[in-house]
């Protein structure tokens, strides 16, 4: 191509298989229209960030505020595919901060009456000290997130017997100490936001 040519690439990811990646591509990357994709991304972010409106302050302060909100919503990534499959890497031997001899499994999320997965599975950094900030802010602006994340964490525990501290690609990382995910799950329940998993089942996982 010439130096003035534009090069376009569509890219998707699957944690399960190349076949699933191709299916994700067909579902999620349906156009070569770059401007249309950009507008859709802007509309999506405006919808999420626009749930909290601020007035006053300088343009620089407002920019910083919404940049911080963007970070609040970043860092947790779906690992399930369009067909509902996701990797389970919880079955192995713990060795310090790692899991050895992992037996990789592919699991499939259940679907509701409308054919949608009941919740998504997520990667996430640890929830260390988020009871002071993230848990509260999510509950105010994005109440579906504590519900989604709690359901994901509970399913990790169903698969591997532990509620993850920082779930990664369907497995455990053993980062931090204690169980920083617990305040998030309890917060979702106390606020009446836990709808995608059974609270009693979640409680029994701690016994």
Briefly describe each language-model feature range:
Residues 5, 145, 151-152, 156-205:
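Active-site cavity-forming subdomains of large catalytic enzyme subunits
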Residues 69-82, 122-146, 186-193:
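Alpha-helical support elements that line or immediately flank enzyme active sites
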Residues 10-122, 142:
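Function-dense linear segments that define catalytic or interfacial modules
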Residues 60-61, 120-129, 173-181:
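Secondary-structure capping and boundary motifs in well-ordered enzyme cores
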């Amino acid at each position: 191509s010439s130096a003035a040519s534009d090069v376009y690439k569509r890219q998707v990811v699957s944690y399960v298989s190349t076949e699933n990646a191709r299916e994700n591509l067909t579902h999620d990357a349906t156009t070569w229209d770059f401007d249309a994709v950009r507008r859709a991304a802007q509309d999506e972010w405006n919808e999420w960030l626009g749930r909290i409106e601020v007035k006053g302050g300088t343009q620089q302060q407002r920019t910083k505020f919404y940049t911080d909100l963007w970070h609040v919503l970043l860092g947790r990534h779906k690992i399930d595919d369009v067909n509902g499959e996701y990797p389970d890497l919880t079955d192995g031997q713990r060795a310090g901060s790692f899991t050895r001899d992992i037996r990789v499994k592919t699991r499939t999320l259940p679907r509701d009456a409308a054919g949608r997965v009941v919740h998504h599975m997520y990667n996430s950094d640890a929830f260390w000290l988020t009871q002071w900030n993230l848990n509260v802010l999510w509950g105010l602006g994005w109440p579906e997130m504590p519900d989604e994340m709690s359901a994901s964490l509970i399913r990790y525990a169903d698969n591997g017997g532990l509620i993850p501290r920082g779930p990664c690609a369907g497995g455990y990382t053993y980062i931090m100490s204690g169980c920083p995910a617990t305040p998030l799950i309890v917060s979702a329940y106390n606020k009446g936001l836990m709808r995608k998993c059974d609270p009693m089942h979640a409680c029994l996982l701690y016994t």
